[in-house]
From Swiss-Prot:
Lineage: Bacteria, Pseudomonadati, Pseudomonadota, Gammaproteobacteria, Enterobacterales
Keywords of this entry: Virulence
NCBIfam families hit by this protein: PRK15368.1
Protein name, UniProt field: SpiC homolog
Organism expressing this protein natively: Salmonella typhi
Function: Putative virulence protein.
Amino acid sequence: MLAVLKGIPLIQDIRAEGNSRSWIMTIDGHPARGEIFSEAFSISLFLNDLESLPKPCLAYVTLLLAAHPDVHDYAIQLTADGGWLNGYYTTSSSSELIAIEIEKHLALTCILKNVIRNHHKLYSGGV
């Protein structure tokens, strides 16, 4: 799977992390990480630090994901680093399909980053 991901132009600086199941990378300049499972793998793109992702904003973003019928393969993951948008992929997909899905994942990440930034400005008195 690592070889397939290395062949996708949007993915840069990919390397194994600790064990062969996890990787860190950048996707079009955005921090990302991945993990492989038995027949699937996930890629997480960094959204924002937790300070800029308060509970009301997190609830709003989560509802946006839940309400849209075409984003059922995505989830928000919270870590000590911040919030990540997780996308799930099957290992049996072609490299072309994986590349297309990663482009969609990146686009959704950029949209959500913008929503978070605007939400933060609105509720922190920046607008």
